Amino acid sequence: MDPRLRLDVLIPTHNRAPMLERCVRSVLSATPTPRLLVHVTVICNGCTDDSRDVVRWLQMSYPGMITLLEERRRGKSKALNAAIEATGGDLVGMIDDDEEVAPEWLTVIADAFTDPHLDFIGGPYVPICDTPLPDWLPDEYLAVVGAVDNGSAPRPYGRDFPGILKGGNAVIRRRALQLVGPYAEHLGPGSFSRLFSCEDEDMYWRLLEARRVGRYYPTLVINHYIETSRLSREYFRRWCFWRGVSRGLMDRRHPLPVPYLAGIPRFLWGRAGRALLRLSRLRSRRPARDVFTDELRMWDVAGYFCGRQVYTLARFSPVASRRDGSDHGYAAMQHELARMEELAPAEERHMDDVELAG
């Protein structure tokens, strides 16, 4: 019996062939360890570029180490679920196609999972951009462009952790995934031009609710390439609104342990109200970064309200369908999302192509 842990590295991709090649090579050229048997699965999620040719060429360079999987249903969660079902390794690693892992990435994984009680790990994202980050970009919203740093020391994930297990740099034991179930397919970048997210946040809370043990490792580093199209105020506004919608949807299953007002956490109302007052009174005397931070906080709460109250899960609820044992709610939701895709303006569909795999 092979004593090595089998690591499946899953990479969903959508029309990012040049980045995809760098991503795959970074995994297979990382410092090897005799304790891991590594296999990469690339999931082409509605690709219309030459991503498949890139993967086939890489398969010749790394024989037996790369699998190409097709998932025609658009959506990162769908792609991940298909790959999780198609693979069988002890560990499931997940990265995005616009990332490169650091050379020690595999070694950190092997060291961490010598602990048989550890169920999942994550690490920081180092942003890489061809242009300087704009002065107006708020520190509070760096995660919008994929910059994540939760400190220089290992620490356990849990209710007191200042963040979540981000889906672009995560390794989870398969037995833990089998326990908590697949990624929520109504969350995350998907099939129509809305910047849904939070599929990783939903998974994180389910892991914690199942009492799975996780740890953040500052040495589990990935480098994340930032597309210049994301460095605009308009993108940040859209991202914050749709992140709010996603959190409002997720709130049905994972309510926060705080007081609520009109279905929204009361502290969000307070934060948005204070931001509105500052915007109305002090706009001309404040730094642009502070002004934009307050504006984004208002987009946050507006999206949360829409997700919680307007995108009513009474109409199409995968959460409800799990309760009653049927899939009618999920099917209705998919029908509604497909209808919205048909109505989406062409320019928003282009933005969806930019966002889908990231």
PLM region descriptions:
Residues E140-G163:
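Short, flexible, basic/aromatic active-site loop/helix in glycosyltransferases
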Residues S26, C44-D53:
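A conserved acidic beta->alpha catalytic loop
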Residues E104-L137:
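Conserved donor NDP-sugar-binding/catalytic core segment of glycosyltransferases
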Residues M1-S29, R35:
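N-proximal low-complexity "stem/linker" segments adjacent to membrane-targeting elements
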Residues L165, P189-M203:
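Acidic donor-binding loop at a coil-to-helix junction in glycosyltransferase catalytic cores
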